[in-house]
A protein has these predicted regions:
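A glycine- and small/hydrophobic-rich beta-loop-beta segment
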Residues: 150-160
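Conserved, mostly hydrophobic/aromatic
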Residues: 15, 32, 68, 96, ...
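Ferredoxin-type iron-sulfur electron-transfer modules in oxidoreductases and energy-metabolism complexes
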Residues: 13, 17-20
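Canonical Radical SAM [4Fe-4S] cluster-binding loop centered on the CxxxCxxC motif
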Residues: 1-13
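Radical SAM enzyme [4Fe-4S]-AdoMet core and its adjacent flexible, acidic
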Residues: 41-62, 109-112, 172-203
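Conserved SAM/AdoMet-binding glycine-rich loop
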Residues: 24-147, 158
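Glycine-rich phosphate-binding active-site loops on the catalytic face of alpha/beta enzymes
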Residues: 164-171
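Terminal RNA-binding accessory module
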Residues: 180-269
Length: 269
């Protein structure tokens, strides 16, 4: 946030018009992208929340799927969770960056939430949308991170059981307070922690992905498969990739696909 500058919100009418144009062109899925979508609308002349914007987009004929990212845990509202619960179009996937499971490190990062708030939020989301896929971002080796802090992160990973996680080794970023902090962590310690985290994340991801094998689910076909011309590639509502036999005329269509085999990060259908 120090480097990216202040949030700015596009006018809702402008967004709706663009979505309507896309729908008229045959687009069935849209992605709403923002540094923090949950802060949307606060600086508009006529304030509108992100939850209200989603409700308006839901009304657009032709749009079958709505995705959004990124959601900052500090201001993901109960209203947004309620809209997700009642929506027929919002995809069953939420990217909810954790960064660290240690409340002490989160405070140093100026994240404005703590471990307890994050876990309570996950419980609320799962109660509202039980089949939602949760993904996250985690940084290992932030200045001052102790072994106890790292274990707090591992504890959150085990409790939340993410469908997948983007794991990063901390690197100094010019213009951020952390770049000049003392207590920079030795590289060998960071590497060892990163490897432990990655192993845990991958184990949980594989267990969760395997649970869908054998089910028939809706897949939006996105493209011809790059490796095998007899296959097309699509995506489940939960954002998982599926490869299946198909032809180019299927691109842009939503089809029911039986998931025959889980290959770790993708399915064969």
């Amino acid at each position: 946030p120090y480097v990216r500058g202040r949030d700015r919100s596009r006018e809702p009418k402008e967004i709706i018009r663009e979505v309507e144009r896309l729908a008229a062109d045959g687009v069935v899925e849209i992605m709403l992208l923002g540094q923090n979508v949950n802060s949307y609308g606060k600086n508009l002349e006529q304030p509108m929340t992100f939850a209200q914007l989603l409700q308006e987009i839901e009304k657009v004929d032709g749009i079958e799927r709505i995705r959004f990212m990124t959601s900052h845990p500090k201001d993901l509202s109960d209203d947004l969770i309620e809209v997700m619960k009642n929506s027929k179009k919002i995809c069953k996937h939420l990217h909810l960056p954790l960064q660290s499971g240690s409340s002490r490190i989160l405070k140093l990062m100026n994240r404005r939430y703590d471990k307890e708030h994050y876990l309570e939020l996950v419980d609320k989301i799962r109660a509202a949308v039980p089949d939602i896929a949760l993904t996250t971002d985690i940084i290992v080796g932030f200045p001052g991170e102790t072994e106890e802090d790292f274990e707090e992160t591992m504890d959150v990973v085990r409790k939340v059981r993410y469908d997948s996680a983007f794991t990063f080794i901390y690197s100094k970023r010019t213009g951020t307070p952390a770049a000049v902090m003392e207590d920079q962590i030795p590289e060998d310690v960071i590497k060892a922690r990163f490897d432990r985290l990655l192993k845990e994340v991958q184990t949980i991801s594989a267990e969760k992905a395997g649970a869908l094998t054998g089910q028939t689910l809706s897949v939006l076909i996105e493209e011809k498969n790059e490796q095998d011309a007899s296959l097309v590639t699509g995506r489940l509502s939960n954002n998982s990739v599926v490869h299946l036999p198909g032809t180019e005329d299927m691109i842009g269509k939503i089809v029911n696909v039986k998931l025959l085999e889980c290959k770790g990060f993708y399915y064969m259908g």
